[in-house]
Amino acid sequence: MTAPTPDPSIPPTAATAVRLGLPGGEAVTHRDVAANGARFHVAELGDGPLVLLLHGFPQFWWTWRHQLTALADAGYRAVAMDLRGVGGSDRTPRGYNPANLALDITGVVRSLGEPDAALVGHDLGGYLAWTAAVMRPKLVRRLVVSSMPHPRRWRSAMLSDFGQTRASSHIWGFQRPFVPERQLVADDGALVGDLIRDWSGPRPPEEEDLAVYRRAMCIPSTAHCSIEPYRWMMRSMARPDGLQFNRRMKRPVRVPTLHLHGSLDPVMRTRSAAGSGEYVEAPYRWRLFDGLGHFPHEEDPVAFSTELVNWLKDPEPDR
């Protein structure tokens, strides 16, 4: 798929850089919904049980373009949202801790008029999906996480595994004031393309697709808002609010869970993600995609979407 080529003479805005079409020309619906005191942009396709898709860093809803079509074709109401501070959603001055971001997600479920949803989260979106399943279990029908361990395993790996600490060096770099924001938008967001390319396996997204993410990062304030959650996640480790969050996440996930990971993921090591099932008291399936990196849903969208749809349709997913 090749993304629409933006006009470099036009400064990026949410309207021009985010409200895009889908690869096959399907009539995706863009709209805004209110939740948890903010406005969120969503892209929607299809009818049926709600599947809410949550992007990671450094992306926005468009990362799920292939899965929106696959899910809609399979009989689901597929909705990809932009997280707080990203894409077409509000850039608020605060509220980027994971507990509040999880309330954004469950609030969007309610604003869409649904009693619950299957949450599908990648990277940071996966971290928040784990969190939402613990905090608001009645609103989460099923849970799918890609490229992200359970928050408690993430914390443990970051503190005790030098290999994981080194793999996540970008997160440590985010702790500096001002500098990361400037780096992300320099040269029309060139670093965004470099990160996605470097974190992918042998089949990274096309350059035209990387240009879409670069342009979206250059929307004013997006770079700052994109890294604020990671600042909280690191700086709060020894603070009372972070310790309270970590204790809260000891409560088990009690919904069927599918955990997907790329064997070549250089950002989140397989050994850090594997074993997250210890926090799930429900059917849990671990699936490792050989030869894929940090973005399996983009690197091999057919394999990822097939695994996702088959599992969602399985009435009794295995442990």
Q: What do the PLM-derived regions correspond to, one by one?
A:
Residues 60-61, 127, 292:
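A short, glycine- and basic residue-enriched loop/turn
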Residues 41-88:
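Conserved HGGG/HGGXW glycine-rich cap/lid loop of the alpha/beta-hydrolase fold
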Residues 57, 149, 295:
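Active-site pre-Tyr helix/loop in NAD(P)-dependent dehydrogenases
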Residues 2-29, 38-40, 79, 86-120, ...:
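Flexible "cap/lid" subdomain of the alpha/beta-hydrolase fold that forms the substrate-access gate
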Residues 292-301, 305:
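Catalytic histidine-centered segment of alpha/beta-hydrolase-like enzymes
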